[in-house]
Amino acid sequence: MKDIFLIRHGRQCSKLCNVDVSLDESGRKQAKLAGKRLISYQLEKLYCSQLIRAKETAEIIGHCVNLPVEEVADIEEIHFGGFTGKTDEQIRTEYAEFRKERASHKEDLPYPEGGECGRDVVKRVMPKIKQICQREENRVAIVTHGGVIRSVCADILHTGQENKLKFGIDLENTSF
């Protein structure tokens, strides 16, 4: 039986939706605290998304648990389409109809303008997680993103992607 810790990256510098930026000071502190908490779990391998905030989080954790970090392609955050690079206020204004439809809809809707839905994320990410599971290490951590963790958990728990925000997983930065 393998133990896999899915860890959300630390807090980032930008408040813009899904831009590839560094951690802020709080995010670095969060990563260090997560690393200290993970010492007792005796991780054997540490993986991360290729986005800067996940890499920086993993590097700080890796320093704490004395492990190198291996970057994994295709475990990046859900592609938010037209939301990318916009503030919350811009999204609320420009995509009010989409947000309303998404909140009331029973389907797992993709984000507008070429964005992904949860099923798309699962199709992209699960093959990578399965590859990690086939490796020899039994206790691993993967530093990734909130949308990825929610989508993967919804898939594993068979709750349906449309319910991924409702089943009570607290995904504060660096939670696992």
Which stretches of residues belong to each language-model region?
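GST superfamily/GST-like fold recognition
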Residues: 146-150, 175
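A short acidic, helix-capping loop that chelates divalent metal ions and anchors anionic groups
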Residues: 13-17, 78-83, 109-113
